[in-house]
Amino acid sequence: MNHATSELHDESAVTSVPETTRIQDLKALVKMGIVNSNTLTVFTGFWLALHFNGLSVMDNLDKLFFTIVGSGLVMAGVCCLNNYIDRDIDPLMERTKTRPTVTGKYKPGFALTFGLVILLLGFVFLLLTTPMAVLMGFIGAFTYVVLYSLWTKRKYTLNTVVGSISGAVPPLIGWAAIDPSLGHPIAWMLFLIMFIWQIPHFLALAMKRVDEYRNAGIPMLPVVHGFEITKRQIMIWTVCLLPLPFYMSGLGITFMVIATLLNIGWIVLGFYGFRKKDDIKWSVQMFVYSLNYLTILFVSMIVVTFF
């Protein structure tokens, strides 16, 4: 890993620090975009657990509050810790060089302390639901901070797969807050969807940002093995999503049709990449599709329960 970044760090901190408010800096520190997107999956897990256990959301508003706040704090905490860990390589990447731990808006010690405090506070909130929700939160946090950020991210191309484990945990946190047995198969389908989805999503991003990852010394798959192998891996993982809706028949035929159409659309776009000459443009299209895919899919899971 290239650690000779002090000059670049100093230069970015002195000459190119963007004008931001304290609130904007705090949002960047906790990666609010990631927190918000994962909150949807937490809520979906919570909602579906209510639905399949015949429970009312109005009777569980307290648990909903503790679940959303607790999981949000856990995710914000691990994102803070990730910013702290990556402060030496973030200046080398265009999309991360303005993070407050790079620009000096927040000192490393603050990021570390603040991250640990809100992480622990998140566990306290989750404990007000069920111990299993805390365990799921801990597994997600440990995987992201230790197994991904500290271990595999800078050493192995499998970093994307390892990181996807932590990103697949949020719906299980939501489900466990209502049903700590996690015995319903749909709970684990949510986990599998999130796990598999993240791999083509982040590999597409890695293709788009391949030069930045190369400069930072991060062994993402397209950096180490090139675009052709990366495109094959993207296709393999995308195809793996195809059968999952059929294990979620409890959500009805409408959801199964929506999910299958989304999967087919992603697969078709994926195959198109083998005929397209502009790999970067294709990777952007795949990345954007993946974002819309996840939002539509998880919102659909909630909507179909009303009919």
Curated annotation (Swiss-Prot):
It is an enzyme of class 2 (transferase). One of its GO terms (molecular function) is protoheme IX farnesyltransferase activity. The chain crosses the membrane at residues 32-52, 65-85, 108-128, 131-151, 158-178, 186-206, 251-271, 287-307. CDD domains: PT_UbiA_Cox10 (cd13957). It catalyses: heme b + (2E,6E)-farnesyl diphosphate + H2O = Fe(II)-heme o + diphosphate. The keyword Nucleotide-binding does not apply. It holds the Pfam family UbiA. It comes from the Bacteria. Its EC number is 2.5.1.141. One of its GO terms (cellular component) is plasma membrane. Pathway: Porphyrin-containing compound metabolism; heme O biosynthesis; heme O from protoheme: step 1/1. It is found in: Cell membrane. It is a multi-pass membrane protein. Keywords: Cell membrane, Heme biosynthesis, Membrane, Transferase, Transmembrane, Transmembrane helix. InterPro entries: Protohaem_IX_farnesylTrfase, UbiA_prenyltransferase, UbiA_prenylTrfase_CS, UbiA_sf. Belongs to the UbiA prenyltransferase family. Protoheme IX farnesyltransferase subfamily. Interacts with CtaA. Carbon 2 of the heme B porphyrin ring is defined according to the Fischer nomenclature. This is Protoheme IX farnesyltransferase.
